[in-house]
């Protein structure tokens, strides 16, 4: 079931800008929220947009950015897949780097979006981080750091996921 569902999700995300937007919005809805509440949020967002009670200011920025940039993000993620492959460290690093540009999306959630696009990376939650003996802050990425440091931290995260 896992492989079947992952394949379906990847096809949805990579086929159209709307499909990619869909998984980005889904990811935004999972931030600090149990999965059981995601459907409720998505229904509300579809009906009320960023005026939904579920949408905070930062989540609204992410939703608006993803909507406005869906075509560019979709073209970029497909270009990354074509250039680097989905099963390489370079491909996963580039995918995560692309998605951290979305407001409200940190490195871990960017990994989740990239994973749903078929790249070999994941979304390591607090429980996984603790099991690995790392501090939760180890995976926090300051988006204002220099590009070389950002890319290095993303690459380390991708390797950790493998």
Segment roles from a protein language model:
Residues 1-12, 18, 70-78, 89-162:
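C-terminal accessory module of base-excision DNA glycosylases/AP lyases that mediates lesion recognition
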Residues 24-33, 74-81, 158:
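Short, amphipathic alpha-helical segments that act as regulatory/interfacial helices
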């Amino acid at each position: 079931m896992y492989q079947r569902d992952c394949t379906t999700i990847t096809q949805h995300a990579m086929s159209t800008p709307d499909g990619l937007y869909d998984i980005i919005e889904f990811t935004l809805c999972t931030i600090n929220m149990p999965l059981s509440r995601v459907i409720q949020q998505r229904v509300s967002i579809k009906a009320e947009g960023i005026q939904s009670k579920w949408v905070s200011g930062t989540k609204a920025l992410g939703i608006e950015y993803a909507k406005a940039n869906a075509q560019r993000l979709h073209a970029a993620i497909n270009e990354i897949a074509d250039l680097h492959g989905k099963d390489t460290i370079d491909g996963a690093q580039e995918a995560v780097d692309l998605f951290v540009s979305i407001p409200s999306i940190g490195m871990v959630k960017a990994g989740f979006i990239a994973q749903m696009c078929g790249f070999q990376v994941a979304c390591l939650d607090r429980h996984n981080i603790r099991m690995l003996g790392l501090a939760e802050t180890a995976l926090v990425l300051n988006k204002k750091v220099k590009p070389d440091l950002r890319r290095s931290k993303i690459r380390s995260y991708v390797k950790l996921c493998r």
